Amino acid sequence: MWIDPNVYTGRPADKRIPKEERCYDLLDSLGISFTRVDHEHADTIEACQEIEKLLGCEICKNLFLTNRQMTEVWLLLMPGEKPFKTKLLSKQIGSARLSFASPEQMLQYLDITPGSVSVLGLMNDKEKKVRLLIDRDLSGQEAIGMHPCINTSSLRIRTADVLEKLLPAMAHEPTFVGLPWNQDET
């Protein structure tokens, strides 16, 4: 996979697709500084490992989930290497059964395609239908890595800026959850 070895500060000088540009516009308007790495499509956590080394932070796992009836949707942010077990999360949020939302739902709610899901997509959730869940282990990290709504760039943003500036600006209050590192924990 091609990765530009340069780490850039701020938005790119060249033109990008509109949804990526909107991410940079939002971050700039909030005074949130970030570093950026450009690369080929990186749509799995495994593909992001070399990018993480350049950014100096972990790119979090972003899971877009729905209930069985497809009447509620959640965006879960968690450490990339942490295993995910739906049963444990379902119990914490009081939902009978969770599954991965469809690509159509990702587009409908976040204007994002699979492999590009990120907390920045919440800026496109104008009706505030998506409930944000954040694993508590992320809140202790200095910075969080994420895509700017497209998986050909990755950003490093201070966790405090995400929690204190970005989420309030997008009017999304997170619910913090505790997911175990060990699959056997309940």
For the regions a protein language model found, what residue spans apply to each?
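Extended, low-hydrophobicity, polar/charged segments
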Residues: M1-T186
